[in-house]
């Protein structure tokens, strides 16, 4: 296989996997090129070399399974450490690049492409083999139809000792050379695909970390809202005992307190489960306690124009590089199929000693040259050419589609960053106003102007405003890391996108 596919995935946005909205998964371009090893001859003249018209393996397109479970899974390494481990975003990404299942599977595919390249190379390299044999024989000539008057029917036993080395050298094989070049391009495509997978893992781990950080902020906000509800209940009870409010105000405050208690329980559960998901994605040992040690504050996104972003993406995206290498591999596969019509030249020989026993051996050798000229292959070469041309068109179409998809992804990511930045501004203003509303409602209730219904409603508005702010901040940071992925620089530049220029 010497082709590669760029599989475009689309997922419905959701809390669990929002980073997969427009992730372009570059498929591994695995080469399965190579010539069969020439058979090694026994004593005597070498066996004929493989015919030149033997069809080379056709290039094909390999599409690995694009499962989000690969990014959510990881291979746990090490042992559980005592105490609570402090986990920063940088440490989480380093662990993810080392332990995440998607990276490990892509690395294996890259090694397979490397093995296929060696297989193609082996068809062009000399083959050397040695053998030592000692044989004792007794034959019945009559069994083979030989009968001579005065000549014994039974001959032997006689002994033959032979020690010999064999050499097979493919002198000229144009199709095999093109096959090797195609495998080189496929190996390069596989390496680019591996780098693309690392970028996707950086985005996946960063998103899991951002989700865990957002859930932690939700727990903190829920705790603050519970404290506010408890204080409001205490104030309502004091005023009830003083005879300034009715029992309804006390009951309403208790309902609000219990609502905040329930909300805190749910938030803590979500946070704990999200931390488990992050731990699994980066390969933390099961049961390892940790805390998030790196808050992700609001920092402006890098400023760039659409044209600059598109040019950067086409220059840096590993999956686009893999697609171009796949086209090149397919072009060379077409040449390899066509060049099977050309003659090939092989040289073979052996040298050794042979005799009745070791001390009576005499050296012998055989040298042979062979030109293989395909005259009629039964349509095998024509079939290989048709298949190679079809896969070339497929690789070209996939590369063109990926180029268009990159343009869409970059534009969409820039739109998301712009919209999320505006959402953060609106959410910040709304949170400030909600807190101001709560202060005014509390003062009115304390002054006896009205009941605590306004205060309870204001507390709910504060909760909504806090949730909107946390969600908008997460969306903004997720949009920035998505932009880094769309540009092809997620692994190299995620810190500058999330933490700002330093």
Where do the protein language model's features map onto the residues?
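A detector for short, charged/polar N-terminal pre-domain segments
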Residues: 76-83
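Acidic, low-complexity, intrinsically disordered peripheral segments
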Residues: 9, 13-22, 41-58, 138, ...
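Sec/SRP-type N-terminal targeting helices
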Residues: 104-105, 121-122, 157-160, 171-198, ...
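Short segments within alpha-helical structural elements
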Residues: 122, 259-284, 420, 431-489
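A small-residue-enriched
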Residues: 44-69, 74, 94-172, 193, ...
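Bacterial N-terminal signal peptides
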Residues: 23-39
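Periplasmic alpha-helical coiled-coil/stalk elements that build and connect Gram-negative outer-membrane
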Residues: 192, 198-312, 416, 420, ...
């Amino acid at each position: 296989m010497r082709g590669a596919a760029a599989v475009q995935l689309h997922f419905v946005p959701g809390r669990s996997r929002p980073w997969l909205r427009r992730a372009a998964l570059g498929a591994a371009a695995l080469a399965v090129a190579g010539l069969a090893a020439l058979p090694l001859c026994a004593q005597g003249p070498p066996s004929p070399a493989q015919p030149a018209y033997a069809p080379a393996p056709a290039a094909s397109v390999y599409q690995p399974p694009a499962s989000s479970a690969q990014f959510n899974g990881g291979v746990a390494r090490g042992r559980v450490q005592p105490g609570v481990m402090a986990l920063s975003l940088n440490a989480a990404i380093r662990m993810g690049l080392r332990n995440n299942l998607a990276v490990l599977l892509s690395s294996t595919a890259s090694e397979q492409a490397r093995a296929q390249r060696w297989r193609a190379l082996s068809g062009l390299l000399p083959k050397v083999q040695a053998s030592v044999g000692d044989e004792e024989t007794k034959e019945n000539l009559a069994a083979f139809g030989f009968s001579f008057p005065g000549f014994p029917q039974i001959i032997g036993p006689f002994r033959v000792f032979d020690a010999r080395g064999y050499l097979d050298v493919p002198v000229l094989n144009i199709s095999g050379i093109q096959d090797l070049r195609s495998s080189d391009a496929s190996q390069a495509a596989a390496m680019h695909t591996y780098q693309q997978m690392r970028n996707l893992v950086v985005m996946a781990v960063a998103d899991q970390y951002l989700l865990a950080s957002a859930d932690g902020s939700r727990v903190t906000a829920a705790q603050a809202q519970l404290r506010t509800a408890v204080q409001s209940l205490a104030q309502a009870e004091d005023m009830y005992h003083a005879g300034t409010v009715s029992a309804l105000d006390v009951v309403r405050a208790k309902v609000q307190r219990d609502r905040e208690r329930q909300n805190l329980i749910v938030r803590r559960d979500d946070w704990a489960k999200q931390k488990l998901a992050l731990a699994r994605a980066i390969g933390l040992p099961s049961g390892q306690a940790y805390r998030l040690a790196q808050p992700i504050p609001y920092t402006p996104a890098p400023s760039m124009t659409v044209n600059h972003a598109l040019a950067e993406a086409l220059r840096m995206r590993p999956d686009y590089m893999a697609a171009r290498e796949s086209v090149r591999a397919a072009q060379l596969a077409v040449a390899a199929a066509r060049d099977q019509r050309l003659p090939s030249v092989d040289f073979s020989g052996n040298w050794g000693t042979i005799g009745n026993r070791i001390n009576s051996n005499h050296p012998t050798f055989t040298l042979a040259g062979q030109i293989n000229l395909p005259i009629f292959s039964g349509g095998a070469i024509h079939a290989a050419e048709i298949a190679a041309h079809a896969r070339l068109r497929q690789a070209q179409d996939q590369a063109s589609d990926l180029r268009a998809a990159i343009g869409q992804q970059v534009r969409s990511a820039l739109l998301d960053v712009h919209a999320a930045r505006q959402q953060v501004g609106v959410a910040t203003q709304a949170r400030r106003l909600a807190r101001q509303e709560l202060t005014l409602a509390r003062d009115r209730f304390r002054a006896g102007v009205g009941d605590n219904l306004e205060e309870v409603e204001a507390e709910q508005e504060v909760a909504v405003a806090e949730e909107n702010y946390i969600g908008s901040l997460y969306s903004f940071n997720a949009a920035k890391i998505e932009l880094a992925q769309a540009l092809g620089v997620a692994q190299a530049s995620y810190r500058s996108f999330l933490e700002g220029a330093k």
